[in-house]
A protein has these predicted regions:
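Short, hydrophobic alpha-helical packing/hinge segments within bilobed ligand-binding/sensory domains
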Residues: 79-81, 89, 99-100, 126, ...
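Ligand-site clamp/hinge motif
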Residues: 28, 56-102, 231, 240-242
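Ligand-binding "clamshell"
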Residues: 101-112, 256-259, 272-274
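Periplasmic-binding protein-like
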Residues: 109-124
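Append "and occasionally in soluble cytosolic enzymes with long acidic Gly/Pro-rich linkers
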Residues: 131-232
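Periplasmic binding protein-like
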Residues: 235-274
Length: 274
């Protein structure tokens, strides 16, 4: 392998599960299928539903373990849990944290590890309401990250200030964040002129309601739960939060007039290199 510049983390990249060697001359089919080097060959793909594979007769590392493999897309966490319990599927990835105890026994092989996955709330600075610094501060102070970790992630994580874990040399306390302080958030909003004048629980300012459109997606099991938690906690301080949890989030996100906050989850340093 020849790189255009020194790349000391090359071996890390090659070991990344998302790292692939693809035959670019073969190209990509209309269905999105590529020619790679893995133990299985994709025979059909229905995006968002099902991927069918058959063993690669020319695999470089011995006989693949199965003749055929079917990969199903199951976005709903409860449905995924029941499918594995009933034997409808043989294995699962991305199980909801709340379901972990059901499979941590001798009947299943269960594997999990800490990663650099972080949950983000991206604020849209092209949105008029997000341009108000008081609104941004109130959102940051009004989301109870500790409770989200404890209750919805079942303790599998910790509240983060930055995008990288504490054990990274470029992470930890390099960034500070607002503490959860709903009363302080209320004070900031009131001082900025956001007041509930009609008693409906939603603040207003100059005829505009304190409404934010929260865009997210359902394929990461915890994101819809985060949206509901935020809707509740920000609702307590006078926000109206309108949730749009959709698989079509990417096409919506390119339109800056269609959302105010975009929530996502991603592994920030899968190879140890930011």
């Amino acid at each position: 392998i020849t790189t255009a510049e020194p790349r000391p983390t090359l071996l890390n990249y090659l070991s990344d599960p998302y790292g692939c060697i693809i035959d670019m001359e073969a190209g990509v089919t209309e269905d999105g299928i590529v020619s790679g080097t893995g133990p299985y060959v994709a025979t059909s793909l229905v995006t968002g539903e099902e991927l069918n594979l058959e063993k690669n007769e020319n695999y470089w590392d011995g006989e693949p373990g199965f003749d055929n493999v079917t990969v199903l897309t199951i976005s709903d966490g409860d449905t995924l849990t029941m499918a594995l319990q009933s034997g409808e599927i043989d294995g699962a990835y991305g199980m909801p944290y709340a379901s972990y105890p059901l499979f941590q026994n001798e009947d299943y092989t269960f594997s999990s590890c800490a990663t650099s996955r972080a949950f983000f709330a991206h604020m849209n600075f092209e949105s008029e309401i997000i341009q108000d610094s008081a609104v941004r501060q109130a959102i940051a102070m009004g989301i109870d990250k500790e409770r989200f970790v404890d209750d919805l992630l079942d303790g599998n994580g910790y509240p983060a200030a930055g995008v990288y874990p504490d054990n990274f040399s470029f992470g930890g306390d390099a960034v500070t964040a607002k503490e959860y302080d709903p009363d302080g958030a209320k004070t900031i909003l009131e001082e900025a002129g956001w007041v509930d004048t009609d008693g409906d629980g939603i603040r207003e300012k100059d005829g505009q309601t304190l409404t934010i459109r929260w865009l997210t997606y359902p394929s990461r099991q915890e994101l819809p739960l985060l949206a509901e938690a935020v809707q509740s906690s920000l609702g307590d301080i006078g926000f109206e939060v309108i949730i749009n949890s959709t698989a079509d989030h990417n096409s919506i996100r390119v339109d800056p007039t269609a959302w105010d906050v975009y929530a996502s989850a991603m592994v920030t340093a899968p190879t140890g290199d930011p």
